[in-house]
Amino acid sequence: SRTGNRKKQSRTSNQKNGYALKLEQSYGGARDNTVTIKNSGSKQSVLTSSGYQITTSSGDSNYTQIVNLEGDIVLKNLDETKEPLGIKLGTGSKLLDTESARNLIPNGGFSVKEADGNKYIYGSYANAAGKAADGNITLLHDYKGNEPINSGSKSAALDLDGHTYTYTGKTAAINVNYPNVEFTVKNGKVVATDETTDGAHLIGAPNESNMNNRSLTLDGVELTVPGDVCGIITNGTETGNKVTLKNSTLNVENGFGIYFPSSGKVTIDNSVINAKHAGVQVCSGSLTIVGETAITVTGQPQEKTDADGPIADGAAVSIVNRDGYKKLETVNIENGVFNSAADVEAVRAYSFNNADKTENEWSEAGNVVEVTGGSFSSNIAENIVNSDMQATTTSGGETRFVVGKTAVENAIQALKSGDKITFKKVADDAVITVPENVEITNSTGKDITVNGDTFEVGETTTAHVWDTEYTIDKEATCTEDGSKSIHCTTPGCTAKKDVQIIPAAHKLENVAEQQATCKAEGIKAHQHCTVCGKDFIDGVEKTVDELKITKLAHTYVDGKCTVCGESDSNYNPGTMNPEQMIPSQPNDTNKPDNRMDNPETGDGSNLTLPIIILSVSGIGLSGIFIYLRKRKCNR
């Protein structure tokens, strides 16, 4: 171990691309060592240069140099307008990972956790990958330089952590350079600057006998290469290779997206490929495309002049049955948006003769390729399509061929007034709702239902959008039926359906019974129509007279009604009413006296009381009735 104590001291190099402090061992003198750069003073130490401020190296990758910085040490660029380059961690050199140490590695820096439990920072991915105990490496800062991302001999994952890795070299930005390795790059951007540089290689060295079983996964990565090259490429002589594009974007706007001639598997999941000559081309192995994938190819087909390498056929997805290549397994296109240039098939499946460099029909394509979903810029060969939902849409002058339930539903939702859709196949259980004023053609060979309407085979018409509630077209009256129907909601459209009769009917109100009295007639309980004025009982029309309840008789006492007080016009005060007859019993102590006070009259004469005694011989006295008759006397 060595300690450099720079107490109260700063160092400056005025040389072009010079360094302030060099801690490098020669190859012959290489050994494991620890170097500590320490400022034990109270004042800040400053290391200034135009190149790296500190350079380090163990001299041999078989040996390790651990670099520590302690105290207040600042790195500066000789040109104050530029950021310092920091520490250059060379071969076998690493820096204990601390927050302050990370700031000393402004260009890149790769952090790993090693077997001793500590985290260290390396200057290159290759050095870091060989030491990572758990296979996880994290990029600390944006990187720009000529060192590619080489996987190394161990399976690992590089987390770009939102940073950009800019490769200025001329081979490939990413290289899975060992067999039996699974390598993942995630969460960031990888950019190649040279037009001769491929994006990623899974290609063995020419003298390597076994470079099989290599895997590359890009997860959440945007990989961009500028030239007429390949975004990702494998070797046709190898087996068991895997390429996975997940939530990623591959930009090769002047070249090929993915060229996969080796056996193995390609998976494109919810990713974007932008290319010129072909989006993804497989000549062996298998291919699966799922999720919201979008592949766009802008170029026209080009004549093939050599027997090897990718074919510029202009297809978004290209499946080539090629002489001398390993067997094609299965190709499944389940969803996505696939675009090729005008008059170029978006999905092509064909045979290619390497000898005469010609394309031929591939009769077995339907046994290998299956398209079950997606939206395509061109029609797809019937022998490779397998879906009971197929349609063609025309919108804004662009025609698309849509396959699969999800893709057809998405295409319908995107339609606008004036657009067109032709249904080629419709599942029996499909529920189809098309926006208003869209022209619909039924080319399915059977009747279909759209927006609740039946469309016959071959019929072309504009789709109605029906209201969810009935509209009253004619009000019913007491004597005439009315009608209601479902109307089309499209402005200016007068179409209607499901017309229903509203039966003629009275608008009845219940009228309660009015009981009869001795003064007025009553009215029976009934129903009264507020429109026509007619009255009904139990649905039978009644006249006014039929509703009447006869008046009750008066109950008179002493010439007056005990209910309403009305006088009896027939009442004669001099006549004994039957009600005034009071029967007398022999022992009735309450019987009236035989005498009545005689009221005085004007002439002073007396009232005489006649007494009549009736007797029945042999039977005895059976009763005595006393009749009192008042006689008016004058005083």
Regions found by a protein language model. Give the residues of each.
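C-terminal low-complexity, Ser/Thr- and acidic/Pro-rich disordered "stalk" regions positioned immediately N-terminal
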Residues: T555-G604
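Extracellular/surface recognition and adhesion modules
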Residues: A128, L139, L158, I289, ...
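C-terminal membrane-anchoring or membrane-association module
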Residues: V616-R635
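Short, hydrophobic alpha-helical membrane anchors of single-pass surface/secreted proteins
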Residues: S605-V616
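Low-complexity, Pro/Thr/Ser/Gly/Ala-rich linker/spacer regions in secreted
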Residues: S100-K113, V402-A411, T454-W466, V499-K507, ...
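Surface-exposed loop/turn motifs in large extracellular/passenger domains
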Residues: S1-E83, L89-N107, D134, N150-D159, ...
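N-terminal extracellular ligand-recognition/capping segment immediately after the signal peptide
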Residues: L78, G135-A156, L160-A172, G227-D228, ...
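Acidic Gly/Asp/Thr-rich repetitive segments characteristic of extracellular carbohydrate-active
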Residues: G109-L140, G397-K424
